[in-house]
């Protein structure tokens, strides 16, 4: 166990944030990379050394105000940030995480998305594809309504993509909650007489979470 301690404003949180950056590709608190770059500078550099049971790793990251971040592991450029999750797994708990209980469902979704992405790298890819399709659909809906229309064949195409990716996302989340229930429930029983039960309640009331049911729901609720 490692404990990092020091006076206020000495950079303790910065160290943890830097480690988290190499696990998830982004900060746990900043909305954009620009917020992580020192005032007056155009870029910032991070580096980390770690190892597993098989080999040692050295990772580097450069953040630029006007461009994408550049990441490499052992000298090999990483094109997709989701790849980082296969090297370094990190779980961060901060005071803000109390929002998991007190906050809105979006807080809990962000926690689940971050955790599931580390367990199943394909989940991150699926989630990214889903969000891109959702943006395209919303843009098309805005255009159609401006023209006084309410349906278009292209909408069904985007609904098909959303249904395909969305059904997979819900399955991943459901599996994660079941796994979390198994382990967290046992820990809760050791420290308390209370029973901990977590339930996954998606906004789409779809019992089988099938792609077909998801598509029908989207077609009916444009």
Residues of each region from the PLM?
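Conserved NTPase motor "head" modules and their coupling/switch loops across ABC/AAA+ ATPases, GTPases
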Residues: 1-7, 20-21, 31, 149-222
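Short amphipathic alpha-helical segments enriched in hydrophobics
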Residues: 19, 23-26, 141
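Intracellular alpha-helical coupling/juxtamembrane segments of multi-pass membrane proteins
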Residues: 36-39, 130-133, 173
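Conserved lysine of the Walker
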Residues: 11-12
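Long, charged N-terminal accessory/stalk domains
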Residues: 99-100, 106-149, 153-156, 160
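Short, charged low-complexity intrinsically disordered segments located at boundaries
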Residues: 46-52, 119, 139-146, 162-173, ...
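Nucleotide-state sensing region of NTPase/ATPase domains
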Residues: 23-107, 113-119, 123, 181, ...
């Amino acid at each position: 166990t490692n404990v990092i301690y020091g006076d206020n404003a000495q950079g303790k949180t910065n160290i943890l944030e830097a480690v988290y950056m190499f696990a998830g590709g982004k900060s746990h608190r900043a909305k954009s990379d620009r917020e992580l770059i020192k005032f007056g500078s155009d870029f910032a550099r991070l580096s980390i050394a770690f190892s597993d049971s098989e080999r040692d790793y050295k990772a580097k990251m450069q953040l630029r105000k006007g461009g994408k971040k550049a990441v490499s592991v052992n000298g090999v450029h990483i094109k997709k940030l989701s790849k980082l999750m296969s090297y370094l797994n990190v779980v961060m708990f901060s005071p803000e995480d109390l929002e998991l209980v007190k906050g809105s469902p979006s807080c809990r979704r962000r926690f689940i998305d971050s955790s599931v992405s580390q367990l199943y790298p394909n989940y991150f890819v699926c989630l990214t594809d889903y969000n891109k399709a959702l943006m395209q659909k919303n843009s098309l809906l805005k255009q159609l309504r401006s023209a006084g229309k309410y349906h278009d064949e292209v909408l069904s195409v985007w609904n098909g993509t959303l249904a395909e990716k969305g059904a997979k996302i819900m399955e991943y989340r459901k599996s994660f909650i079941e796994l979390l229930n198994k382990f967290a429930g046992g820990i809760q029983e050791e420290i308390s007489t209370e029973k901990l039960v977590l339930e996954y309640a998606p906004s789409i009331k779809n019992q089988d979470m099938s792609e077909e049911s998801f598509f029908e729901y989207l077609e009916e609720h444009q």
